[in-house]
């Protein structure tokens, strides 16, 4: 029987154990949805896990669906995530950034200029969403136009590139090869 606390090799990546910390939205980002020192400390304290999966990080301003979630679409956010990553690495941990766009699960209070959220279709979700003003009913999103897809894909690629540091490339490429085999 495999011990949960034994190392695990995935291609060229060695995890210190088989514990993976799942994504948890913390709502602790600062002004401009920038990861703060508190975010860095939170993840650093959990560096003993074999791998940390971060809270979901929106790829663009329109991708936010909760207040104070750290994005990966501005230079300040990228710098904030670098501090988080450096803190985890300094504590001997491994960390992977989860990228996302919430689609219709948002509210105009969380969108640039108070615009309606954008989603694949104009279907209003049931329920409520937390905003800085408190709980709000979901609204009907605006359907994404086909012509908008290339720009949205480009934003996702830019977010991936922002998260794809030299260190990440060194670790993720072997991991991707290991997963394929």
Predicted regions and their residues:
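An N-cap/entry alpha-helix motif that binds or orients negatively charged groups
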Residues: 1-11, 19, 23-41
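Structural preference for beta-strand elements that scaffold enzyme active sites
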Residues: 18-20, 51-53, 94-96, 170-171
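Conserved, mostly hydrophobic/aromatic
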Residues: 21, 46, 88, 97
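Catalytic domains of carbohydrate-active enzymes, especially glycoside hydrolases
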Residues: 38-60, 161-171
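A non-catalytic, amphipathic alpha-helix used as a structural packing/dimerization or gating element
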Residues: 41, 45, 80-83, 87, ...
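Glycine-rich, proline-tolerant flexible connector loops at the mouths of alpha/beta enzymes
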Residues: 53-78, 99-112, 172-181
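Alpha-helix-loop-beta-strand connector modules within alpha/beta enzyme cores
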Residues: 69-95
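Non-globular sequence segments
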Residues: 100-162
């Amino acid at each position: 029987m495999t011990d949960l606390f034994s190392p695990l090799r995935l291609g060229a990546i060695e995890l210190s154990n088989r514990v993976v910390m799942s994504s948890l939205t913390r709502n602790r980002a600062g002004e401009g949805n920038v990861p703060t020192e508190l975010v860095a400390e939170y993840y650093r304290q959990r560096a003993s896990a074999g791998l940390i999966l971060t809270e979901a990080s929106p790829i663009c301003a329109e991708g936010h669906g909760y207040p104070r979630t750290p994005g990966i679409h501005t230079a300040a956010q990228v710098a904030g995530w670098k501090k988080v990553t450096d803190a985890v690495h300094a504590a001997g941990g491994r960390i992977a950034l989860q990228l996302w766009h919430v689609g219709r699960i948002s509210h105009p209070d969380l969108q640039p200029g108070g615009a309606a959220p954008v989603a694949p279709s104009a279907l209003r979700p049931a329920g409520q969403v937390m905003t800085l003003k408190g709980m709000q009913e979901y609204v009907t999103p605006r359907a994404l136009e086909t012509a908008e897809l290339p720009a949205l894909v480009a934003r996702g690629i830019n977010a991936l590139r922002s998260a794809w540091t030299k260190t990440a490339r060194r670790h993720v490429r072997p991991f991707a090869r290991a997963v394929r085999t």
